[in-house]
Amino acid sequence: MAYEFVPLKEKYQKEVVPVLMKEFGYKNIHEVPRLVKVVINMGVGEGSRNKDVIEAHARELTTIAGQKAIITKAKKSISNFKIRKGMSVGVKVTLRGPRMYNFVYKLVNLVLPKVRDFRGLNPNSFDGKGNYSFGLTEQLVFPEISPDQIKRIQGMDIVVVTTAKRDEEARRLLELLGFPFKKQ
């Protein structure tokens, strides 16, 4: 398997778990919050009119994630947006296991430092159940994407799903994994 190098999972097991057990007073190792999945989504509005745009972004997302991206379809028709039910409206990929850990490692160490005018992630973007969402404005910050290949700059949403029950537990987990949050 090509995904054997997983430095973030080792860091989680050796450094993060003991710190979280001590800070939050967990008695069982299975109570400690962990990452479940990372969902990367690109909403491509122009894709409903131009199939080539959707396919190009699907290829880019596949390259970024290392896993085949799926094209999402509209669930219902919205006349104001000129969208009918079943039209292609975006691209997404769900990462779990070693691919997820490698993506998060790459995101924290390579991608976020390359973002222009980056001051840290917003610590208020948790959903109340321990999941964290944020957006990137362009796909050029990923090392796999070269500016010559892309036709159109497109942003993306990234959702990090954890088993944490509360936002403070999830935030501490992500801080220990290296996510750079803004100081409040």
Curated annotation (Swiss-Prot):
Tree of life domain: Bacteria
Keyword Nucleus attached: no
GO biological process terms held by the UniProt record: translation
Gene Ontology molecular function: rRNA binding; structural constituent of ribosome; tRNA binding
UniProt xrefs under Pfam families: Ribosomal_L5, Ribosomal_L5_C
Keyword terms: Ribonucleoprotein, Ribosomal protein, RNA-binding, rRNA-binding, tRNA-binding
Gene3D superfamilies: 3.30.1440.10
GO cellular component, one term: ribosome
Transcription found in the keyword field: no
SUPFAM superfamilies given in the database record: RL5-like
Subunit structure: Part of the 50S ribosomal subunit; part of the 5S rRNA/L5/L18/L25 subcomplex. Contacts the 5S rRNA and the P site tRNA. Forms a bridge to the 30S subunit in the 70S ribosome.
PANTHER family, per database record: 60S RIBOSOMAL PROTEIN L11-RELATED
Annotated function: This is one of the proteins that bind and probably mediate the attachment of the 5S RNA into the large ribosomal subunit, where it forms part of the central protuberance. In the 70S ribosome it contacts protein S13 of the 30S subunit (bridge B1b), connecting the 2 subunits; this bridge is implicated in subunit movement. Contacts the P site tRNA; the 5S rRNA and some of its associated proteins might help stabilize positioning of ribosome-bound tRNAs.
Similarity field: Belongs to the universal ribosomal protein uL5 family.
Name of the protein this chain belongs to: Large ribosomal subunit protein uL5
Gene designation: rplE
